[in-house]
């Protein structure tokens, strides 16, 4: 089975910032707090919390549970119980703590299957470390549509990037997509469209250079997702694999990205047996 561990909170994610980054956040937060959407901006600020300077000289926000020094022990227990581990880590501080926990036990990365859930605000250095450790990242492109407008009111300070899917994929990270329902819409076609278009709910672009192709987004939902879950006989249609498939009313590769969420499933097949039919 798979155990879930939270390295940070959801709304109170663990960001680790320099003094310069904190000043940038304060400026954008103040500006947004007096702007036309000040109510939303102030609510976001309350949920993010106030950064605290810690002995490492960096400023940290968010909830960390368990304490970072407990993570290596938790990972070791998972390895000894033959469990995989899904670590909830939204902010760069949380992702870095997962990498440090793996580094603290030299053989741990080979003994336990670990995947990072979310990794929403990270920089190029962390992306390189995730890739070097071949750590899968399970991301939620639907968050771009559901929460992108709110998050861009007070954007993460550079060099942090918001859901940098293109950079992750190009670096060699096994990138898997999920919905995180009910936090975002369950429909995977909404997620595919979000990964390809990177538009928020108001139609504004969010770092469009981080967009994926439709084919890449579909792979993240299928083949890479199966690999991340350790399923050797799923995720692709080929001899020897399970005949798990859906029949849809449109070809996603020939459908406009904006129309992808409207694709309808006509029938579902599991192990070669039809288990659902709308026709």
Segments (PLM) and residue ranges:
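A structural microfeature
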Residues: 266-267, 276
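Metal-coordinating catalytic core of metallo-dependent amide/deamination hydrolases
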Residues: 1-92, 100, 129-136, 141, ...
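Short proline/glycine-enriched turn/loop segments at secondary-structure junctions
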Residues: 255-260
């Amino acid at each position: 089975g798979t155990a879930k561990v939270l390295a940070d909170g959801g709304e109170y994610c663990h960001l680790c910032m320099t003094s310069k980054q904190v000043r940038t956040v304060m400026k954008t937060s103040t500006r947004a707090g007096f702007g036309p959407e000040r109510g939303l901006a102030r609510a976001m600020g309350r949920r993010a919390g106030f950064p605290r300077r810690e002995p490492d000289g960096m400023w940290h926000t968010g909830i960390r549970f368990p304490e970072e020094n407990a993570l290596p022990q938790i990972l070791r227990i998972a390895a000894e119980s033959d469990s995989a581990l899904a670590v909830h880590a939204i902010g760069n501080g949380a992702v870095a703590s997962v990498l440090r926990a793996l580094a603290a036990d030299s053989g741990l990365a080979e003994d336990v299957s670990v995947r990072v859930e979310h990794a929403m605000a990270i920089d190029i250095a962390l992306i390189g470390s995730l890739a070097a450790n071949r750590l899968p990242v399970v991301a939620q492109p639907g968050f771009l549509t559901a929460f992108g407008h709110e998050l861009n009111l007070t954007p993460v300070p550079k060099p942090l990037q918001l859901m940098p899917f293109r950079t992750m994929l190009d670096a060699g990270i096994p990138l898997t997509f999920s919905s995180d329902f009910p936090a975002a819409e369950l429909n995977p076609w909404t997620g595919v469209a979000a990964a390809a278009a990177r538009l928020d709910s108001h139609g504004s672009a969010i770092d469009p250079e981080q967009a994926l192709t439709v084919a890449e987004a579909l792979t993240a939902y299928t083949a890479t997702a199966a690999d991340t879950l350790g399923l050797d006989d799923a995720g692709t249609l080929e001899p020897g694999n399970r005949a798990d498939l859906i029949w849809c009313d449109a070809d996603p590769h020939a459908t406009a990205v904006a129309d992808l969420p409207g694709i309808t499933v006509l029938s579902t097949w599991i192990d070669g047996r039809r288990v659902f039919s709308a026709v």
